[in-house]
Amino acid sequence: MSRRNWVNFFSRGQGFDLTNDLERGYESALLIQNLELEFYGDRLVRSDVELGVPKSVQASILRRFRAALLICRTTLESVERNRGQFDLQELRQLQLIEAVVSRYGYQLPSGGSPAISRAPEALPRSLLGFFDTVRRQLDPASEETVVAGFRRRRNSTLISLRILLLLILVPLLIQQVAGAYIISPAVDRLSPELPFLSYPKPKLEEQAVEKLRVYKQELEFDALLNSDQPLEADQLRQKLAEKAIELKDEADGLSVQAVKNVFSDLSALIAFTVVCFASRDDLRVMRGFFDEAVYGLSDSAKAFAIILFTDIFVGFHSPEGWTVLLNGIAKHLGLPSQENFVMLFIATFPVILATIFKYWIFRYLNRVSPSSVATLKGMNGSG
């Protein structure tokens, strides 16, 4: 490996380390905010405040707080020199970490409780940030830093697109190839010998009986139109017997095909799981890529996407869509469509989705992007 390749390799490794450190710090900052909101009424965490919970629980909360605050401070120390390489989303994460750390003292106490610093700063942090921005712009190495940040964002985009294509194409290819060359021949060969490979098919038999009845009526109708004498009983019985055998073979084929679909879907699920497990680092990169894309949208675009998603899955017209989806899945798997199950699913699952979504807006989106929540309320017609 050439010297340039070694340098690029270690540069990419350093970029991934920065991303991982920043992600850990961001999650720790969110944890601290959650503790403040849930237990301290959106105020600072203090050890001298009685929470009305058992002492063991309060001690656990303080331990989690101290560990998260230590991670935030360590993150700031490790990523401060590489601030110029961060994209917009990562800078927002870094600002959240700085905001959390600035609310507390810099030194962790040696005792069991965190010391809360409320001393005024000599200069506002915004002014210090302005001076730091000017210093970075005048730095002779700033151009290299910007280029390194661009390369890291480009690598992040390429990795995200690659893992997205792998997550889509690999399960589909495995499903088609395994179904056509492995599962289908094996099921066709073993289904006559192994009865459990054939579904019980009362629904298919009902459909076959209905088709046979319609076929008999068509024969009688054609006989009345095309000849003066109706079909004899033996001729009618023979034609119906041939049609019954044809319908039976068709029902057996549909039953066997449902078994093939089940095994093909399982192979696709296994392939998807393997890709996810083998590409965990790439999935974290893709998560950051999509976070940046989502946060780059305007408030109106975010609100529009949220309203579109909720109206499709939990809106007024969503029951029809869920009915079509469930019936399609049941047909694909060879299962009879149960109207009671469909109605129960429609009555419960969209409600659960709506509850989760409202909780997400209250606990996460309302803190990260309050303007998006205000725009969402205005577009949705609620106060």
Curated annotation (Swiss-Prot):
Its main location: membrane. It is a multi-pass membrane protein. One of its GO terms (molecular function) is proton transmembrane transporter activity. One of its GO terms (cellular component) is plasma membrane. NCBIfam families: PRK02507.1-4. Required for H(+) efflux immediately after light irradiation to form a rapid H(+) concentration gradient across the thylakoid membranes. Together with PxcL, contributes to transient H(+) uptake following dark to light transition. This is Proton extrusion protein PxcA. It comes from Synechococcus sp. (strain CC9902).
